[in-house]
Every structure is written in structure tokens, then in C-alpha cells.
Amino acid sequence: MAGTNPRAARIAALIQRVVASSIERELHDKRLASITVTEVRVTNDLQIAKVYWTQLGHEGHEEGERKRAQQALDQAKGHLRSLVGHKAGLRLTPQLQFVFDEVPGEAHEIEDILAVAKKRDEELARARATAQYAGDADPYKHDDEPSDDFEDDSDEE
């Protein structure tokens, strides 16, 4: 992907800017109102550009809205590709593939799981602070046994 080829990385950044600004300013489709382009990855041969997108505020939980947005992006794919070609000045414009970015939704779920774990840790710490032994502090020590603190009388003269 774009990580190994500096030219591919530059083109990916350009495609991200062009596609994001075009969705915001030129495409007047209500289905794309809350779309954000999160990343673009271009193959080293510059033939394919995967455009990762997400919907703000939805994190992928609204399946119907996500499908409608995907359809709108697929319909606008040709227009967006021509805009990229015009602004980039490339001999061959990469084919655009729109992929829903699952990372924000998964990150939200992970944050929820971590919050629950933190709450449980705090409850455990409070329980530990007030905990007492079920029996004696040292279950192996009995009151009827002599203590180990004996003095050695052999040194006295």
C-alpha cells in the first residue's frame, strides 16, 4: 500500500483531500451529509485507491444509513474519479473503491469495555480496603503454643 512508496503516499493524501472536499462542497446528496473520509490507501502501481470512510455519530450501528451512503458513494465514484484525475494531473487516475471504516465503531466498543473494567477494578479496590481475614491473620499460629521469641541463655556467664 502507500506505506512503501512515497509517491503513492502523496497521491493518497491528495485523493483524500479531493474526495473529502468534493463530498462536502460539490455532491449535494443528503445521504452523504455526515460522511468523513478517514484514510486513503493507494497501491504501489497507482491503479487502485481504497477510500475509507465513516459516518459521524453513527459508528456503523445504523446499517440502513450506512448502506444508503455506500450506494451514494458508488454512484458518485465516476465523478469523484474524474475530479481526482483533473486535480492530480495523473496520466492514469486510480480506480476508487469505497470501504466503510470499522475502526471508530470498534474503538467506541473498546472504550465501553475499558470503562466497565475500570469500574470493576475500583469496586475490587474498595472491597480490598475494607476486607478482613476470615480467621486469624496468621492461621498457623496458635495461642497455646510458645512463641518463637525465646532468649538464648547460653551466652551468659
From Swiss-Prot:
Sequence segments annotated as region (Disordered): 126-157
Q: Which domain of life is it from?
A: Bacteria
Q: GO molecular-function annotation terms?
A: ribosomal small subunit binding
* Biological process according to GO: maturation of SSU-rRNA
Q: Name one GO cellular component term.
A: cytosol
Q: Which SUPFAM superfamilies match?
A: Ribosome-binding factor A, RbfA (SSF89919)
Compositional bias ranges of the Acidic residues kind:
145-157
| Coiled-coil stretches | none
Task: Indicate yes or no for the key word Cytoplasm.
Answer: yes
Annotated compartments: Cytoplasm
Keywords assigned by UniProt? Cytoplasm, Ribosome biogenesis
Its job:
One of several proteins that assist in the late maturation steps of the functional core of the 30S ribosomal subunit. Associates with free 30S ribosomal subunits (but not with 30S subunits that are part of 70S ribosomes or polysomes). Required for efficient processing of 16S rRNA. May interact with the 5'-terminal helix region of 16S rRNA.
Q: How does it assemble?
A: Monomer. Binds 30S ribosomal subunits, but not 50S ribosomal subunits or 70S ribosomes.
What family name appears in the similarity comment? Belongs to the RbfA family.
- Protein's name according to its UniProt entry: Ribosome-binding factor A
Organism lineage: Bacteria, Bacillati, Actinomycetota, Actinomycetes, Bifidobacteriales
